[in-house]
Amino acid sequence: TVVAYDSSGSLWASRFWWVLNYYGHNNSKVLDGGWKKWFDEGRPVSIDRPVKKEVTFTPKLEPGLVCLIDDAMSAIGNDETLFLDVRSDGEWSGTVDRGNSRSGRIPDAVHLEWLNFVKNDKHHTFKSPQELRDILEAAGVTPEKEIVTY
């Protein structure tokens, strides 16, 4: 099992978890609350190098986890597909370009900044499944639609 964690509200750990799943490593998890919560709760930590274990990993792509550009272009305006923009408010509004040559969003996308999915506590732990369902449903993100996040 791979347990991913970070000190950024699980933003990068979640991205890494997704990458592992995309390459077929389905035995992975994100540590809720990350390194800071682990440390603050007095859980064991070490500065020793872990002992390397020889393993063989054979990637097996999960193509259903990505949306190709051509597929995205043909899905714009399709009521069966919803684009969910989880970037920052500034990226959504186009006031922050993060180095891109253009700013803005995919037409008709729904915006829910990723911070809406974590609690406003010092560890940014994940909200409960019911809270997440309520947030998503209120934004029109429902199970019968194909959801494309970015």
What residues fall within each predicted segment?
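Positively charged, proline/Ser/Thr-rich regional signature most characteristic
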Residues: 1, 74-144
